[in-house]
Amino acid sequence: MSQHFTSIFENLRFVTIKRSTNAQQQQQQQQQQLQQQQQQLQQQKAQTQQQNSRKIKTQATPTLNGNGLLSGNPNGGGGDSSPSHEVDHPGGAQGAQAAGGLPSSSGTPLRHHKRASISTASPPIRERRGTNTSIVVELDGSGSGSGSGGGGVGVGQGAGCPPSGSCTASGKSSRELSPSPKNQQQPRKMSQDYRSRAGSFMHLDDEGRSLLMRKPMRLKNIEGRPEVYDTLHCKGREILSCSKATCTSSIMNIGNAAVEARKSDLILEHAKDFLEQYFTSIKRTSSTAHETRWKQVRQSIETTGHYQLTETELIYGAKLAWRNSSRCIGRIQWSKLQVFDCRYVTTTSGMFEAICNHIKYATNKGNLRSAITIFPQRTDAKHDYRIWNNQLISYAGYKQADGKIIGDPMNVEFTEVCTKLGWKSKGSEWDILPLVVSANGHDPDYFDYPPELILEVPLTHPKFEWFSDLGLRWYALPAVSSMLFDVGGIQFTATTFSGWYMSTEIGSRNLCDTNRRNMLETVALKMQLDTRTPTSLWKDKAVVEMNIAVLHSYQSRNVTIVDHHTASESFMKHFENESKLRNGCPADWIWIVPPLSGSITPVFHQEMALYYLKPSFEYQDPAWRTHVWKKGRGESKGKKPRRKFNFKQIARAVKFTSKLFGRALSKRIKATVLYATETGKSEQYAKQLCELLGHAFNAQIYCMSDYDISSIEHEALLIVVASTFGNGDPPENGELFSQELYAMRVQESSEHGLQDSSIGSSKSFMKASSRQEFMKLPLQQVKRIDRWDSLRGSTSDTFTEETFGPLSNVRFAVFALGSSAYPNFCAFGQYVDNILGELGGERLLRVAYGDEMCGQEQSFRKWAPEVFKLACETFCLDPEESLSDASLALQNDSLTVNTVRLVPSANKGSLDSSLSKYHNKKVHCCKAKAKPHNLTRLSEGAKTTMLLEICAPGLEYEPGDHVGIFPANRTELVDGLLNRLVGVDNPDEVLQLQLLKEKQTSNGIFKCWEPHDKIPPDTLRNLLARFFDLTTPPSRQLLTLLAGFCEDTADKERLELLVNDSSAYEDWRHWRLPHLLDVLEEFPSCRPPAPLLLAQLTPLQPRFYSISSSPRRVSDEIHLTVAIVKYRCEDGQGDERYGVCSNYLSGLRADDELFMFVRSALGFHLPSDRSRPIILIGPGTGIAPFRSFWQEFQVLSDLDPTAKLPKMWLFFGCRNRDVDLYAEEKAELQKDQILDRVFLALSREQAIPKTYVQDLIEQEFDSLYQLIVQERGHIYVCGDVTMAEHVYQTIRKCIAGKEQKSEAEVETFLLTLRDESRYHEDIFGITLRTAEIHTKSRATARIRMASQP
């Protein structure tokens, strides 16, 4: 990968011609010639404008030739890489000799290629250093071109380069490139603003027509692969440097980027083009965000002359620049580029540390990874940042007095520069050159690398023992460091890009080129080959063995390398992919074809089109040739040399003089934590995880509903904490994220011609995944995946198609929360993990599960440090220093009695506004219409169910929706706590909770008190009653806090036992089901301070109820069907417990206020086609939403008694007839033919066999089958999870028997019902009447917990 970049620079610099001393005189002469030509052409233009302009017909060709385009592109065919092939680089690397090909005896190039030529009306004019000149170019369509064709490619006449700046390679014939003969009658003149290649754009002609050719360019493959049509070249706005009679594409470096700052108008032009590309890539072209961003950029450029790219734009631009690099053979890896944004670095020591971290990350102990580090951008060209090395790692070259060179001949000049700066070398063959960098336009500093940072590979041969005696070696990491990164008009003069080697770059170029190590003849003699005559092919034999040695040496030491055959195949795959995705792939055939094996590689036989796109990587002149030395330093002898710094000195300086800077530098890698939550538990864990990651990363946290999905492709580290709602659904704030992820998956499949007909929607995919996968996998999922398998040994796997996807550069881990009482346990978290993997993401860990039934907190506390450690290892950060602090922070909250307090406040707001802010929801204040009405005839052991009517003016909802009620804790519980807390003087005084926080300023660190960001000012009594969860058994983290405030040693030891013994805690928690007051009474010496306790308590979450009314039946009202929950703990023998919300609602009286919000349940709405049959299945309070359904049809019937209503069957279940809810209403509905049939299942009625709703479904399935299958009816299931699963399995079994289908076919059928929104579920959790299910689920969870390593 790096070959293309690295070699370009090594050999490019070696063959660079020194500047002429009269360069200024030549430039003046060129300008004078230019002015004369302009005058002549203007005269011709005036004559031509008197005639009718003719249009150039393009039906026979996609391009123009003849005098088609001005030559003189300063960078010309310079591209971004050399003919040598360092794979995974935006350009090339180590050497250039194999690029051009030597002439054969017939005068034809030995290397098979054919380039289109460009004709101009005048000799080539090349602009250097950013000079702007206006030129008129005449197109007469008269040029011709020829080229030799090997491998079946013939000579073509009249091949030309198109105005769009493209050049065809590998034998393009004239019939496809020449303009129509009819267009050669009259010259056509075009004016153009000419600039350097690093910043030139095509403009319109005099008639306002675009110069870009719009016709596809046909590219053949001589070996018989499908031909492709390239239209991407139409977007190439840069000018090639070929002339009418000369193709210069085989010249290594036609020109370098200008050193002057780019002008504002040109930056504006580039920025507009780049933003269009960026917003197109995220499918937001012309959106409000696009227009706003363009306005910001334009304003900044007009004000300051430049602008700052966002981090996401920078990452996108870096990847796209690599993708656009026409000379790189390893571009299939373009999306797997790790971008290190170091634009904040302002010193050479900071640059050195960042580069050391780059090398450490990219080397990765031999498992190389592609990466780019980007330093601050160019502003005025007087304060540039530069890396003076052509490669970060290279060997010194010493020229002796007798002309002999020790070391690498390519680096002789730079070695002399280092010596002048004061570097002391050993003078040996394999000295690693120091890093030389300059910051902000200042003179350079040099730094010696720590020896352990550089990985070198001694070269051996699998057959020749004498080979190791040659003492050859090479370094593992090719890292180009002198190219200019050009993106959106902004130029980054200091960037370093690294990938991995292709074997020929080392074996053929670096070691065998005569201008490099020149080992070819030495090896041949050792092999006892006849070197006297070329007919013995001794060179060919020797170079093959040299490449075998290189591959053998790297692979045997598990260092990433790729052979040229694999690289060629990967490029062909990339070429094919790009042709499908972008309708083109810029490619320089001369540089793509490897320097070994030529025509037996597939790339040799592929026609290619050469053109240049932005963003791009550009050549620069060596820094030591352009640097303006301060006070003559570096110009004269005897001056004090620049100071040398070594790694330890820098580390010490950072540690003691700028701890803050060092911390910021180590956190330049962004880590994003996403969460989706229904109760707040996932958010709580996500915040803890974000704090943990913050010890080593730039950690950020987002709720999924607030996250911009377009950013996900550019994340470096993504950690997801996701709850599952109901029976496998995402929480409300995760719905959109799940849909967007699934849309990415569908798009990725369609782009690669794949179709997955088995999964039709994200929800069905979620349930299918969880049903198939979870129960097969033990909870020992917290297991590290061996990432060493990815690139070890033969790296042909590196280029397999399966390793790429839109998220191929994202490392991720998922912690899934849920309850194993549900069949689709943790379905949403598992879905996110599956789909991130399918989109190409790299797992740090397999998905980990947190089971609400048992050990959820224990699982999280075990998983979080592990994922932190692996993340540090992945990004080559040292976890040892921060892991202990991070783990301590995870175990112990940072709040103490000294950092939290309650102070009087006069800012008490209304309860609805306070709850809205606290829960981040719009909360409405409503009133009870009357005292709740009892729906059951009480009998012994019967559970009370009531109908609550609420006045809710202005609240909009649909039948099937839910309402969230914010309850209040019982008064006895609140009063008991107030008596046990320390620091409560007046519980009815309005207080504000404040936290002591540290702030960083230019004057240092200072502390100040700030209000809690969520807990509002209120009385302590109201806070405990309305805002905090006091009834859920306290977590082990809270018990740890309470243990610290026990005065009695025995109480403290018992609490610590619960904290440290997971099994003891789970037994105590599920047996006692203690609320907070119970704990304080069980441990009487524990008296925690009120401020600290409030800061640790979790929010009192809303309780959700299905709405039992239709807004068209009862305007401005909401009806609820509520079961009153009361039970006893300790297997029915302990204290009585009360459901928080149901008992709160049962105590309401007329006009009492209650606080609520509506949550839409789109998946449980009535069908849009009201003619379809409806089957309602819901025992107990599961009937609640169905009342809203039948009320809706009552309204329709009242409005139009003749209207035909759908068939509606109701399956209802209860214990006995005394608790048959809405019995009278149902009877009236049947009478009015709104309910067609009503089935009642009684499970505890005397003298009647025990019957459940699923039993009735099985009995009536023949009729139900007609409704479901033949009439395409809808099934609605509402109730607890156990009932819903039984119903599902019953329908599944009945369909299998009815249609004689396999289990897989039935499962597919039911998933299809979900996809078609014909199988609807509204499921709530385990109810107290299913305690046996609760116990069974918990036992299963404990078994899984015990199986964890």
From Swiss-Prot:
Keyword Ubl conjugation listed: no
Transmembrane segment boundaries: none
CDD domains, per the entry: Nitric_oxide_synthase, NOS_oxygenase_euk
All residue ranges annotated as the Flavodoxin-like domain in the record: 671-868
Annotated Gly residues bias: 142-159
Binding site for FAD: 957-968, 1100-1110
Residues reported in the UniProt entry to bind (6R)-L-erythro-5,6,7,8-tetrahydrobiopterin: 250, 591, 604
Reaction catalyzed: 2 L-arginine + 3 NADPH + 4 O2 + H(+) = 2 L-citrulline + 2 nitric oxide + 3 NADP(+) + 4 H2O
UniProt-annotated stretches for the region Disordered: 23-195
EC number: 1.14.13.39
Residues that coordinate or bind FMN: 814-845
EC class name: oxidoreductase
SUPFAM superfamilies xref list: Ferredoxin reductase-like, C-terminal NADP-linked domain, Flavoproteins, Nitric oxide (NO) synthase oxygenase domain, Riboflavin synthase domain-like
Mechanisms controlling activity: Stimulated by calcium/calmodulin.
Function, in words: Catalyzes the conversion of L-arginine to L-citrulline producing nitric oxide (NO) which is a messenger molecule with diverse functions throughout the body. Truncated isoforms (isoform 3-isoform 6) are able to form intracellular complexes with the full-length protein and serve as dominant negative inhibitors of the enzyme activity.
Similarity comment text for this entry: Belongs to the NOS family.
Protein name (database record): Nitric oxide synthase
Gene encoding the protein: Nos
